[in-house]
Design a protein with these regions (language model features):
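Extracellular/periplasmic helix-loop-helix junction of adjacent transmembrane segments
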Residues: 35-63
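Helix-loop-helix hairpin linking two adjacent transmembrane segments in secondary transporters
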Residues: 103, 130-133, 140-188, 192
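Juxtamembrane intracellular "pre-TM" segments in multi-pass secondary transporters
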Residues: 1-7, 191-222
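Conserved MFS/SLC helix-loop-helix module at the cytosolic interface between two early adjacent transmembrane helices
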Residues: 62-102
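Cytoplasmic helix-loop-helix junction between adjacent transmembrane helices
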Residues: 107-148
Length: 242
């Protein structure tokens, strides 16, 4: 009989969750200094088109956010994270070896779709393990660590560009993805037991969206959040050129 893994300590859990959540931020913010170099390397005629390197990640992430919650409820938290990390890493490889801008954007879409798993499933992991005020405290600690990544990522990307080209930034993020996946596999036990899982159907996603949109409070918050997030994406995509 296979012995269950022991729960990891709070401090290690905080840093593991923060690392997994930071994959999206790294794949976006670390690439900002490299947009001009990417455009030149891939013969992008209009400099404004390089902004799609950023927006493609958000587009892919939008689709993934709808899928990984129900998947993790059916197949377990860790399996869903493995799937997302795998897609994320494949997207990075496509971007690294892309010879034209279309392949670059395809890779970026996959990176966004894959990294969405960490944004969704890490929250489910936290809810599985903690509740009440302790859950709020852990979320605060994880976000406090995570929030440092978007602030540091552009400097990391620029530092890499001083010694290598834009592909080295992708290799750096790829290495962190591998490290995060191995850390998750070795140290973090599965938090959703088999008896608490439910069958996956696309009707679950549809009914969830329908229920959210029917609720006026949820609908209002979603619209407001969308407007704010849209402005943020617009700024982030054009920040490097500005």
């Amino acid at each position: 009989m296979k012995q269950a893994k022991k729960e990891i300590g709070h401090r290690e859990f905080v840093f593991l969750m923060a690392l997994l959540m930071s994959m999206t931020a790294l794949s976006i913010d670390a690439m900002l200094p490299a947009l001009g170099q990417i455009g030149q390397s891939l013969n992008v005629q209009n400099p404004n088109d390089t902004q799609m390197v950023i927006s493609a990640v958000f587009l892919g992430m939008a689709g993934g956010l709808l899928l990984y919650g129900p998947l993790s409820d059916s197949y377990g938290r860790k399996n869903s994270l493995y799937l997302g990390i795998g897609i994320f890493l494949v997207g990075i490889i496509i971007s690294i070896y892309s010879t034209n801008f279309s392949f670059m954007l395809m890779g970026r879409l996959l990176q966004g779709f894959g990294s969405a798993s960490a944004r969704v499933v890490t929250v489910a992991l936290i809810r599985d393990r903690f509740e009440g005020s302790e859950m709020g405290r852990m979320m605060s600690l994880i976000l406090a660590v995570f929030i440092m990544v978007p602030a540091m990522a552009p400097s990391i990307g620029q530092g890499i560009l001083y010694v290598a080209d834009w592909r080295a930034i992708f290799w750096f993020i790829f290495a962190l993805g591998i490290f995060g996946g191995l850390w998750l596999n070795i140290r973090q036990p599965e938090t959703l037991t088999a008896e608490n899982r439910r069958s996956f159907t696309f009707s679950i996603i549809y009914s969830g969206i329908k229920e959210t949109l029917k609720n006026p409070i949820s609908r209002t918050y979603a619209i407001i959040s969308g407007i704010i997030f849209g402005a943020f994406i617009g700024y982030l995509s054009s920040a490097q050129q500005i």
